[in-house]
Amino acid sequence: MTASDLLTLPQLLAQYSSSAPQNKVFYTTSTKNSHSSFKGLESVATDATHLLNNQDPLNTIKDQLSKDILTTVFTDETTLVKSIHHLYSLPNKLPLVITVDLNLQDYSAIPALKDLSFPILISSDLQTAISNADSSYKIATSSLTPVFHFLNLEKIGTSTAIEQDIDFPTLEIANEETKVALSEATDSLTNFELVKGKESITTVIVNLSPYDAEFSSVLPSNVGLIKIRVYRPWNFSKFLEILPSSVTKIAVLQGVSKKSQSNEFQPFLLDFFGNFNELVSRNIEQVVLTNIGNVNDYGNVINTVISNINKKEPDNNLFLGESNEKAEEQAEVTQLISSVKKVVNLEDAYIKVLKQLFSSNLQILNQFSSETIEPSNPEFGFGRFLKQEAQREELISLAKTSLDPSLYLSEDANKIVQLLSKWLSFNGRDLDEAQLQEANATGLEIFQLLQSNQDSSTVLKFLKIAPTSDSFIFKSSWLIGSDAWSYDLGHSGIQQVLSSRKNINVLLIDSEPYDHRKQNQDRKKDVGLYAMNYYSAYVASVAVYASYTQLLTAIIEASKYNGPSIVLAYLPYNSENDTPLEVLKETKNAVESGYWPLYRFNPVYDDPSTDKEAFSLDSSVIRKQLQDFLDRENKLTLLTRKDPSLSRNLKQSAGDALTRKQEKRSKAAFDQLLEGLSGPPLHVYYASDGGNAANLAKRLAARASARGLKATVLSMDDIILEELPGEENVVFITSTAGQGEFPQDGKSFWEALKNDTDLDLASLNVAVFGLGDSEYWPRKEDKHYFNKPSQDLFKRLELLSAKALIPLGLGDDQDADGFQTAYSEWEPKLWEALGVSGAAVDDEPKPVTNEDIKRESNFLRGTISENLKDTSSGGVTHANEQLMKFHGIYTQDDRDIREIRKSQGLEPYYMFMARARLPGGKTTPQQWLALDHLSDTSGNGTLKLTTRATFQIHGVLKKNLKHTLRGMNAVLMDTLAAAGDVNRNVMVSALPTNAKVHQQIADMGKLISDHFLPKTTAYHEVWLEGPEEQDDDPSWPSIFENRKDGPRKKKTLVSGNALVDIEPIYGPTYLPRKFKFNIAVPPYNDVDVLSIDVGLVAIVNPETQIVEGYNVFVGGGMGTTHNNKKTYPRLGSCLGFVKTEDIIPPLEGIVIVQRDHGDRKDRKHARLKYTVDDMGVEGFKQKVEEYWGKKFEPERPFEFKSNIDYFGWIKDETGLNHFTAFIENGRVEDTPDLPQKTGIRKVAEYMLKTNSGHFRLTGNQHLVISNITDEHVAGIKSILKTYKLDNTDFSGLRLSSSSCVGLPTCGLAFAESERFLPDIITQLEDCLEEYGLRHDSIIMRMTGCPNGCSRPWLGELALVGKAPHTYNLMLGGGYLGQRLNKLYKANVKDEEIVDYIKPLFKRYALEREEGEHFGDFCIRVGIIKPTTEGKYFHEDVSEDAY
């Protein structure tokens, strides 16, 4: 094979590594984040395995070597020398090439391998490197012998293109019969080269340093130079052949990194003295070795070398030049330390848990320190522990013999003896946290008594052995194992710990990502199996980003266990620069796949007399190795009894994805057979994220069947590539994801098709239709993203010789009918090409719409009850998905693990989100505790405070869904109408400063919510009727039945004595789209009152503090579709003022007008804002007034001054206290840094105990602890401080930010939101401090899609997700929620966000006017133009935005 493109030297070496068909490539670096010194290697050897220098890489490689596979290793001399013990154990019969970069110029590493029997080639220039690369691979494959190739990349160069044709050989790996002898394979090599020198020279320099060319250019006429090209085999006869007979002195030069302190002969010099007799016969008088460091004056070095060798007694330990500690090496060390510190920050997720649980009782025996790296290894820490143990044993021994009061000349003698006896009883026991505290209090008291009673020899003996109180203290002792700074070579430290049976704990952190699992055979997770076989060790496998609760349990159990404990902790990262979010995603994939199972093994319970099991499985999937262990120990049956679903999970985890794929295809074929069709086959495959492509494919297949074709329809994920050529007629339909990417269920197929060069599709007829949006990426340079998957697929199929039935079809969302415009032309051409265009076809049923689903649902019942009982799937049908929204439930799946489950042949990990209806945003401590409990037992362990001041419980499995809703209703909190095409939760201002006004608007919120609550009895019937086995309390059904308000329990009696459901306001099809009310109280607009369908601005009499009425705004709404100019956000328009006592009828009129005039055909045009614009504000107002029978009064004046929450304590006019706690993005959870969920639970318990206070939720996703009397403020403050809820010292930007849920649970999200925004703000806070903006409030919003849940279009600064890792940056929103923003920059990548925002903040800091807000500033200085009205949202966007 000839190189057609110009390659650099590292790329050429990588190209050689693939010379044999079966090959493996490994390369090592100092950190995960750093690139190989063989620059460009990864671009050629794309499947190369990356290993770290400090993790014994040769041990990993050694286990993967095979005589049938050509293996190449790229490393450096330091890593190689450290692995020399592995090199000696390498078998001879291996095709292995180890290419070594002498990056420290330390050529002494080469003679260090002199006793190996393997060829060693040395390259000091480009041509030699090319020649030796060729030779090394030919020798390795022909003789089955490992070969070492040393070169100096810095000297030769890594970036210069090689401008010559290289014939890369295709090598066959020899076998025992065909292999040649090593001597034959190496015989033709040029071992030595006389670079310069005539027959008359008297001295020759043998150079083993990087300076061949430099030294040869300054040699005196009587001196020659020989360079070494092949060091092993050492062929001294070839050396003598080129050595001029006139030479009497040999100066050997060896490149080293620093001067040696040893005077011993160097190994390289011994090569010459090994042939001493031949030297004597050639009249060689002197052989002297000189070590060469970093050299600049080459002539001076040569003169010094020659002068030294001509002395009668030359210096045999001469070192010339400078130690080779270059700036680059210093930079590498600095980078290494920096990388390790970044890893330590990631590992803090575990270390903080230890510190929180054990605080002053924690002892970490080895910790990272950049100054003293060596003592951080586990062996050192264990040695330190053993020393402490020996001292403790001596102390115990003395205490046991000192229990006689007469030994103490003190009145405290009896007390000392009693305490010593008690202290002794604590030794050798399992101590829980309380016992640990008691034991340490006892030890401290003993030491204090001994110090104050030093009148006896016994006391002096104690103080000699135990000079400090620490000697009496009981610690939870931990060793930390880290891939970055505390690597346990061969797990020797673990073996010592287990063998010792000492009471010590090991936290072993594994950083290997799931997708690298095949690269490393020596996995830490397997240490768990090894440790469990000891039967005397506690073992746990944990993952902080998978199950925080399980981690806490394991750490506590490990510390309590009296013996060795091994806690395997997962923290996967691909780079030291990875964020916690990236670690979280990797963790979820590994746990879900079963690669990293969560479990605990406690030998204390490995006893038939106990009713507990020694092994506890905390995740649902385990792999074969762990299963085999359990089978062998006969514990699997116990596990299965405890968790009946386990056996099914085990079977799933062991299944083969290909088998499942074939089963699915077989079913499709069987269905086709049952139809008894006689026409030609048509296989329809789709790739779809949002469902459009899938629905279109299913519709096409149905139409094909109606025309007599044998049609099947499957996801592209179900294609078996090898069977594709025989499928005759195939249609591919794909939507477009991200930046022109295939949807999730098409990626695997596309990668396989793209990389298969042998596939012949000449017998296949194909058609392709794509769904895209030509304006989604508006920039000219991004236009190629439009329908890129379908276009790429069509070209690839043609390249593989497939025959196109019809031209490629490209659907465009910008067309009048969306993708249907192009599809309606494309489909008839397909029928014509297949010869069925004239077939008689019955009228096709119209597609089922949401309006159909509502109409046929029997007042929101559908088949929800039946679906809940169906255990064959974790999800529900599409129709029930839509109906369950009316019940406050959204179907979700964990998108972080969607791909890994797909690869296993499993359906998405379906789960549900339950949203509470909470008018007024007010909740009791009983309700909070119930939600907290439900989130732990049925949800994902967190609570979400939403941007509409209510709760969401995420991660509820279908089997727990009814229990969750019943648990909420048991505390009089329902979910009816929390979503769906009805009025949803009514949000009101939190208003902690004014109790009287807040009570009025809270009452109004409840009145509106109750008035517009659906009157169907379906909710009660489906979720609440009768008792359930899962009920926590038998009284639940009676609570449901006796509740006076909430969901209706009985149907309405109509004529004919029939009991039916009636919806007097909504009717049987409810509203065209969702509908919301907000209530604001000037000067506070913390609910963004103009952003919603109906906004009520309370007009308060300043003297009486009575709400006299409301200004009514209609037509607000945030939802849009990217680049679809028919959709836009809109602020509400004022219809006028209405008195408080008259408010319900006009509100009902607004709902009725929307019900009757809203667009029920196009859901993207169905919100009230479009109805108002279509009818005109005045036209809409007239319709409402017609229904109401009255006129709106003129709008009353008001002024907003604030849009944010105010944090900390405040007292209202009644004397009650309120504390607003900062809950970032509304996610209430326990983390190592912020145990907020536990803290708020403690607050709720305190409220319940003292009968004081309640909670309020704010529209900015924060929490107000309300109505606390003065006597209980101190108690609440203590709890807040303990659980870090009292911290409000955040930047103004962070305090003013909010975010939607986004990935991974929201099905609409294109990009990260809640999990990413805190990281962005953290990156910005340094510059805020620098610019003097730390305390300035800037409204920042972030969403994963354009639907607007966090009201991003009102943000002064907003990021709206457009594709994975891609956002639109919006600027210019009004600080008071009074103005929409506008697009500033489209398609901003994750890593670009901060770079775009920083200059804006800097300019704002320098040029703003007094009191000017950021959004106003952006408009005043012309950074962005104002959005004057929603319908003009897409206008006046700068061309630079795209």
UniProtKB/Swiss-Prot annotation:
The entry's keywords: 4Fe-4S, Cytoplasm, Heme, Iron, Iron-sulfur, Metal-binding, NADP, Oxidoreductase, Phosphoprotein
Cellular localization per UniProt: Cytoplasm
GO biological processes: hydrogen sulfide biosynthetic process; sulfate assimilation; sulfur amino acid biosynthetic process
Sequence ranges assigned to domain Flavodoxin-like in this UniProt record: 682-831
Pathway: Sulfur metabolism; hydrogen sulfide biosynthesis; hydrogen sulfide from sulfite (NADPH route): step 1/1
Cellular component annotations (GO), alphabetically ordered: cell periphery; cytoplasm; cytoplasmic stress granule; fungal-type vacuole; sulfite reductase complex (NADPH)
Cofactor(s) in the UniProt record: siroheme; [4Fe-4S] cluster
Modified residues (Phosphoserine): S903
Primary location class: cytoplasm
EC number, as in UniProt: 1.8.1.2
Keyword flag Transmembrane helix: no
Catalytic activity: hydrogen sulfide + 3 NADP(+) + 3 H2O = sulfite + 3 NADPH + 4 H(+)
Family statement: Belongs to the nitrite and sulfite reductase 4Fe-4S domain family.
Quaternary structure and partners: Alpha(2)-beta(2). The alpha component is a flavoprotein, the beta component is a hemoprotein.
Chain's role: Catalyzes the reduction of sulfite to sulfide, one of several activities required for the biosynthesis of L-cysteine from sulfate.
Miscellaneous comment as given in the Swiss-Prot or TrEMBL entry: Present with 2900 molecules/cell in log phase SD medium.
Protein name: Sulfite reductase [NADPH] subunit beta
UniProt source species: Saccharomyces cerevisiae (strain ATCC 204508 / S288c)
Lineage: Eukaryota, Fungi, Dikarya, Ascomycota, Saccharomycotina
